[in-house]
Amino acid sequence: MTNIRKTHPLLKIINSSFVDLPAPSSLSSWWNFGSLLGVCLGVQILTGLFLAMHYTSDTATAFNSVTHICRDVNYGWLLRYLHANGASMFFICLYLHVGRGLYYGSYTYSETWNIGILLLFAVMATAFMGYVLPWGQMSFWGATVITNLLSAIPYIGTDLVQWIWGGFSVDKATLTRFFAFHFLLPFIVTALVMVHLLFLHETGSNNPTGIPSDSDMIPFHPYYTIKDILGFLIMLTALSSLVLFSPDLLGDPDNYIPANPLNTPPHIKPEWYFLFAYAILRSIPNKLGGVLALVMSILILAIVPILHVSKQRSMMFRPLSQCLFWLLVAVLFTLTWIGGQPVEHPYIIIGQTASVLYFLIILILMPAISLTENYLLKW
């Protein structure tokens, strides 16, 4: 008799995705982040659902409802901090996942890669709208500054901003719609994740060598299920430690001050995971130019497959490209640091230099070094 997991209409989908899936035998821990992102998404949806039961999306009561959750709801403080720091873990895993894709040439699976970019944008939009909901000072001013960037779009900009705001400033209508979209988007993200996996399973996984591994495959279960569970334990330990020992480490103290449209905070900045893009935005002294650079800093990922000119897929055997990759990582850390600093000397020039380097490495230096390595292969 055939096993039910191979015949049942629903179980056979799960079976072919997580049990009998042929996987390359050489996958390293860098391949753990996909499953970790799945866990993060699950944690965020669950904690978010319970938070939404007690939250009120009204400017008069939003801040107090969050305080009420932390003080009066059973384990409300735990839910709130799991959700806030869960977002940080989500982005750590997300950036490591994208970095893995860049390093090992996974972007040559163009459908999977493009859905991934779409997912990145969707998660960033969700996180931005979620940050507005507690209605603290940084929530209000962050929403005002970032939505106002759309006014840089010629002709329709101002109308577009007022349409998003639902009025002439960030107010009750804005908060209500942001809550609605913040609730809706994670489910759209979940659907996109399924499409992401669908396209991935069409081609099979890449591996660290970048060499086709069709002749050396192992079943996903038990080998990679056990490996993934170890990843879950490490990540959940890190998240628990952050939540239970220093829950406000990654937050902004200004967000404990209720939103006040008459009082601007000295330094308006987004959460840490957007600081690199914020630094690129600020480094250009023109509004429209800054907005374009901001969008391009993420959208540039879409042209990475076109810029791949190397004869080898992975960077595993390309030491020169490896040096450039780690320089890019250093530039991103620098941008993240600069994004949190005030706009004054010497931070301005450091930010501008790092922004130029960021685009220079991806657009010019990486392809140039790849061509050099191709030439060296002939020796």
Swiss-Prot record:
Binding site for heme b b566: H97, H196
GO molecular function, one term: metal ion binding
UniProt cross-references to InterPro entries, sorted A to Z: Cyt_b/b6_C, Cyt_b/b6_C_sf, Cyt_b/b6_N, Cytb/b6-like_sf, Cytochrome_b, Cytochrome_b_C_euk/bac, Cytochrome_b_N_euk/bac, Di-haem_cyt_TM
Cellular localization per UniProt: Mitochondrion inner membrane
Membrane topology qualifier: Multi-pass membrane protein
Signal sequence bounds: none
Subunit comment: The cytochrome bc1 complex contains 11 subunits: 3 respiratory subunits (MT-CYB, CYC1 and UQCRFS1), 2 core proteins (UQCRC1 and UQCRC2) and 6 low-molecular weight proteins (UQCRH/QCR6, UQCRB/QCR7, UQCRQ/QCR8, UQCR10/QCR9, UQCR11/QCR10 and a cleavage product of UQCRFS1). This cytochrome bc1 complex then forms a dimer.
Tagged with keyword Iron: yes
Alphabetical UniProt keywords: Electron transport, Heme, Iron, Membrane, Metal-binding, Mitochondrion, Mitochondrion inner membrane, Respiratory chain, Transmembrane, Transmembrane helix, Transport, Ubiquinone
Protein name (database record): Cytochrome b
Species annotation: Uroderma bilobatum (Tent-making bat)
